């Protein structure tokens, strides 16, 4: 193939074929690069080869098939020689004794070790995985090779990954200027947004700042919800009106924060400094929302004389219209309900995997005392009168607790339901 730009980068090895790695590898292959996609999960590799994706992402299957059919994308379980290596592996958070969390870099370091035998002088390594500040530099210092290393954090939203891979601005931080410029050469082959280059420490911090900002905003909304529950105000109405101010943009409250970014990344700042007390407080507030929801549900049921209830959970994924259950608040809500003697069934038409059993809709609601909505799937938003009429006879008690404010409450009330809304103290 012809080389791209000023640097002789023709072959790229992408390590990790998950939510970020597979779309990135496929995008590069469809833009002319010779790409080897690597994943240690042999089952996943075979599924990709056979066009059987477990990632529910619009347009991804077509993109992957196009890349494989063009012969530009080959997937395998081991690394190989290349001009550039892109690491797209998870960086989960590990719990610490003091109640905080820290970044688990084991997947990143395993990826580095896997490619090390194939890395030659002059090669480029790009780390897309979200990492704490100073990590890129430390990895470079351990390699003892004349290579280039950069950090280009992913910045996409599940459900819109392909669109945002192309349209979003990107930041690339290098351990030196040439590292950043080499990485930029690769990404500008498909990125239509602006690409900003800086040093690796800054790039690492920028990604963490972006998600920390959102986490803190959500924590503020959740604290407002708790206050409004106490003082007799509907927080949703209050936020809507407050946001009419041109310099106010409060996000919505909910049962907690999940996913692989917002619920994790702020901890990577906290672990680096003692000056992140506000960030830690926000993170802890959001982590405690499942307990608040659990206690609110059980308290309301107890007021109605319902002990040891059967509860129907609507939603296992961490956000609407995706199949991703990583760090989902639903897990902790269910865990706490079970610990408090409730029987719990869970319905989610999107989730492909969950720590707790998933039921059909009929199984979930049969004999139930209460429906608790935890995820804002469109299928829940669009429940209409006829659907409610079908649900009613299967329930033991007509109670619904909406933590996302997505149901048409008037329809449920007309059907005889008691409707409870998170953050609505004006019940």
Curated annotation (Swiss-Prot):
GO biological process: polysaccharide biosynthetic process
Enzyme class (EC, first level): oxidoreductase
Keyword annotations from UniProtKB, A to Z: NAD, Oxidoreductase
Annotated positions binding NAD(+): 19-20, 39, 44, 91, 130, 326
The reaction(s) this protein catalyses: UDP-N-acetyl-alpha-D-mannosamine + 2 NAD(+) + H2O = UDP-N-acetyl-alpha-D-mannosaminouronate + 2 NADH + 3 H(+)
Taxonomic superkingdom: Archaea
Residues that coordinate or bind UDP-N-acetyl-alpha-D-mannosaminouronate: 155-156, 207, 211, 214, 245, 247, 258, 318-319, 404
Gene3D superfamilies for this protein: NAD(P)-binding Rossmann-like Domain
Active site as annotated: 207 (proton donor/acceptor), 261 (nucleophile)
InterPro entries from the UniProt entry: 6-PGluconate_DH-like_C_sf, NAD(P)-bd_dom_sf, UDP-Glc/GDP-Man, UDP-Glc/GDP-Man_DH_C, UDP-Glc/GDP-Man_DH_C_sf, UDP-Glc/GDP-Man_DH_dimer, UDP-Glc/GDP-Man_DH_N, UDP_ManNAc/GlcNAc_DH
UniProt EC number: 1.1.1.336
Function: Catalyzes the four-electron oxidation of UDP-N-acetyl-D-mannosamine (UDP-ManNAc), reducing NAD(+) and releasing UDP-N-acetylmannosaminuronic acid (UDP-ManNAcA). Cannot use NADP instead of NAD.
Quaternary data: Homotetramer; probably dimer of dimers.
Database matches in NCBIfam families: NDP-sugDHase
Designated name of the protein: UDP-N-acetyl-D-mannosamine dehydrogenase
Species in which this protein is naturally found: Methanococcus maripaludis (strain DSM 14266 / JCM 13030 / NBRC 101832 / S2 / LL)
Source taxonomy: Archaea, Methanobacteriati, Methanobacteriota, Methanomada group, Methanococci
Gene that specifies this protein: wecC
